[in-house]
A protein has these predicted regions:
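N-terminal anchoring/assembly modules that precede and organize ATP-driven motor systems
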Residues: 1-115
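Hydrophobic anchor at the beta1->P-loop junction of P-loop NTPases
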Residues: 214
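Conserved lysine of the Walker
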Residues: 222
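Conserved P-loop NTPase nucleotide-binding/switch module
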Residues: 243-256, 280-376
Length: 437
C-alpha cells in the first residue's frame, strides 16, 4: 500500500483497529526470539517477522480483508523497525515538517503550508515510546529530569521533543526534514525565491570572500539559502562548519564538521557553539560557517571575520537587516558586558559586509526580500543600504502572493572589492525589476 493512501485515508483508524494492532504487536514481542533475529540479515528478519505477524492475525480470527491484513502487517513492521505511525510521513519526499501536537493530531508541512493528516498514535504512552526510540538512536535521553531534547536522525532530519512536565498536555514532537538533495542557487531561482541577477551578485560576494549574514524567521529558508551559497566556495579552501544539529550539506571535499553536545545525566559535559567557534580558529580554516548564532558566540564569530577568516557565513533569527544588527549587538554585549555600544558597533560594521533577508509568505513561498550592504559607521550608527528588495503587490483569489524583485539602483561599495578579485558585474544588474505575476 502506498504512503499516500496510508497518510490520508482516515477509514480504519478506529479504536478497535488500533487495539488489534497493539495486541498483535505485544504478542509478537512475546513470541519472537530477538536474540536469534539479531544475527540475521535485515531482509530475512523482515520476512520472519512478516510471517509471524501473518500467523498471529490468522490466530486472532479477526475478519480482515487482504488489504486490511497487509496494512496491519506493514504497520507492525513500522513499529518494530521504524518510527511507527510516522513511517509513511518519513517516506513522503514532499513533507518538510512533521508536527505532532497530540497523539490524535498530526500535521505536516508541504509546499510551505500545513495539512492535517490521518496519522494517529494510540495514546500518550505510544507517542512517548516513539520519542524515546528516536532519541536513544542518537545517544540522547528524554525523561522528567531532562524533558527537552534536540537531536538529529541519521538522514539529517532535525528532531525536537518536549514531554511533561514542560509539555502541559502531553508529549510534543517536531521533525524538520531536508530534501534528499540540497537545493542549488539555480533551483531557488526556478522557485522564484530570488532572481538570476540577485544570485549572480550573491555568488560573486561568496567568491570574493565577503562576510554574509542571512536573516529570517523560523522556517523561512535560511539554512536552505546558506547551503546554496556555500556551494560557491572554491573547492581548494578548508571549511569548518559549526551547528547545534548538523544539517548543512556542503559539497566540497575539505569540510570539517562540528556539532554541539548537550549535558550528560550529571549535568556536565555540554559543548556549546562558542567553544566550537574558538576551537575552529585553531583548525586552520579558510572559512567558518556557523549554522546559526544565538548568543555569546556572536562575538567570537565577528572576531574571526575580522582576523583573516573572510568569506564566513552564518544565520540569525531576525525580521529585517536592521533587526539583525540589533540582535548582534545584544549578543555581543552578552559575551562582554564591559564592551561599550560604540565598540560593539565598530566590530559589527567592520566584520559583516552583507545581510540577506529571507521570509516565508502566506502562500508558503519563500523569498529573498532584502540584499543589504553594510556601508560603515556614521557617528555612532551603522549605516545600511538596500541593493535589492522584494516588494509585495497583492494576492490572487487563490491566495498566491504577487510582487516584484527590484534593484534599488544603488551600486554597492563592495563592487570595488569584487573587481579586485577579478569579478565584474554589469551595471544594468543594479537597475533590474522582475515582476512575479
Amino acid at each position: 500500500m502506498g504512503w499516500v493512501n496510508r497518510l490520508f485515508n482516515r477509514e480504519g483508524n478506529t479504536p478497535e483497529y488500533q487495539e488489534l494492532k497493539f495486541t498483535l504487536h505485544r504478542k509478537l514481542l512475546d513470541r519472537i526470539n530477538l536474540e536469534a533475529l539479531s544475527s540475521m540479515a535485515g531482509e530475512r528478519v523482515r520476512t520472519e517477522i512478516r510471517s509471524a505477524v501473518a500467523r498471529l492475525v490468522d490466530e486472532e480470527k479477526t475478519p480482515l480483508s487482504l488489504v486490511e491484513k497487509d496494512r496491519v502487517i506493514e504497520e507492525i513492521l513500522d513499529e518494530v523497525f521504524g518510527l511507527g505511525p510516522l513511517e509513511p510521513l518519513l517516506q513522503d519526499p514532499t513533507v518538510s515538517d512533521i508536527l505532532v501536537t497530540t497523539p490524535k493530531l498530526v500535521y505536516v508541512e508541504r509546499g510551505g503550508k500545513l495539512y492535517r493528516t490521518s496519522v494517529e498514535f494510540k495514546d500518550d504512552a505510544h507517542l512517548l515510546r516513539i520519542i524515546e526510540k528516536i532519541v536513544s538512536r542518537v545517544g540522547r535521553r528524554v525523561d522528567e529530569s531532562s524533558p527537552l531534547v534536540d537531536a538529529r536522525l541519521p538522514d539529517g532530519s532535525r528532531v525536537n521533543a518536549a514531554i511533561p512536565p514542560v509539555a502541559v498536555d502531553g508529549p510534543l514532537l517536531s521533525i524538520r526534514r531536508f530534501g534528499r538533495y540540497a537545493l542549488k542557487g539555480e533551483d531557488l531561482v526556478a522557485k522564484l525565491a530570488l532572481t538570476e541577477g540577485m544570485l549572480d551578485l550573491l555568488k560573486a560576494c561568496v567568491k570574493a570572500r565577503l562576510n554574509i549574514l542571512i536573516c529570517g524567521g523560523t522556517g523561512s529558508g535560511k539554512t536552505t539559502l546558506l547551503n546554496a551559497l556555500s556551494s560557491y566556495i572554491p573547492e581548494d579552501e578548508r571549511i569548518v562548519t559549526i551547528e547545534d544539529a548538523a544539517e548543512l550539506r556542503l559539497q566540497q571535499t575539505h569540510v570539517a564538521r562540528m556539532e554541539t553536545r548537550p549535558a550528560n545525566v550529571e549535568g556536565t559535559g555540554a559543548i556549546h557553539i562558542r567553544q566550537l567557534v574558538i576551537n575552529a580558529l585553531r583548525m586552520r580554516p579558510d572559512r567558518i560557517i556557523v549554522g546559526e548564532v544565538r548568543a555569546e558566540e556572536a562575538l567570537d564569530m565577528l572576531q574571526a571575520m575580522n582576523t583573516g577568516h573572510d568569506g564566513s557565513l552564518t544565520t540569525i533569527h531576525a525580521n529585517t537587516p536592521r533587526d539583525g544588527l540589533g540582535r548582534l549587538e545584544v549578543m555581543v554585549g552578552m559575551a562582554n558586558a564591559n564592551m561599550g555600544l560604540r565598540s560593539i558597533r565598530q566590530q559589527v560594521a567592520s566584520a559583516v559586509n552583507l545581510f540577506v533577508q529571507v521570509a516565508r509568505f502566506s502562500d508558503g513561498s519563500r523569498r529573498v526580500t532584502h540584499i543589504t550592504e553594510v556601508v560603515g559607521m556614521e557617528q555612532d550608527i551603522i549605516t545600511l543600504q538596500d541593493v535589492f528588495l522584494f516588494e509585495k503587490t497583492g494576492i490572487t483569489e487563490s491566495g498566491r502572493v504577487l510582487g516584484r524583485f527590484r534593484a534599488t539602483g544603488i551600486r554597492p561599495r563592495f563592487c570595488e572589492r569584487l573587481k579586485a578579485s577579478g569579478i565584474s558585474l554589469p551595471p544594468q544588474l543594479f537597475q533590474t525589476v522582475v515582476e512575479i505575476n
